A protein has these predicted regions:
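Glycine-rich, acidic
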Residues: 8, 28, 82-83
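Charged, cofactor-coupling segments
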Residues: 38-114
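Short, basic/aromatic beta-hairpin or loop at an interaction surface
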Residues: 21-34
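Short, small-residue-biased leader/transition segments that mark boundaries at the very start
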Residues: 1-2
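Histidine- and/or cysteine-centered catalytic micro-motif in compact active-site loops
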Residues: 18-24, 57-59
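Acidic/glycine-rich phosphate/pyrophosphate-binding loops and surrounding catalytic core
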Residues: 6-20
Length: 114
């Protein structure tokens, strides 16, 4: 996941460290934790049969965030803008499959007119 961090930081963005992707299994937020920052060689070795989410949060400002009093809403500590996306990925014998990509490569909801 190191490459996401390097790419974002080259563009002067930051990767939130307080949240991560997660495994999908018997429970929704399962093992492993999928960090979106770090150094090459750190983290868990991915193995065939693992299913997990990749869901980085990328901030215009600093990577620090805080959770509001409702216990759910997260905001950037410096009030900068942030974006988040998510994909579900499975590790296969020959590599990986991204299950949340559209077969028709939709980049916006198909019911909306361009």
């Amino acid at each position: 996941m190191y490459k996401r961090q390097v790419y974002a930081e080259k563009k002067n963005y930051s990767i939130v460290r307080d949240f991560c992707g997660h495994g999908l299994g018997k429970v929704f937020h399962d093992h492993p934790s999928v960090l979106h920052f770090g150094k090459p060689g750190e983290g868990e070795l991915l193995q065939e049969g693992m299913f997990f989410t990749v869901e980085p949060m990328i901030n215009i400002g600093d990577y620090k965030v805080k959770v509001l009093s409702d216990g759910w809403t997260a905001v950037t500590s410096d009030k900068s803008l942030s974006a988040q996306f998510e994909h579900t990925v499975g590790v296969t014998k020959t590599g990986y499959e991204i299950f949340t990509l559209s077969r028709k490569n939709y980049t916006f909801p198909p019911y909306k007119k361009k």
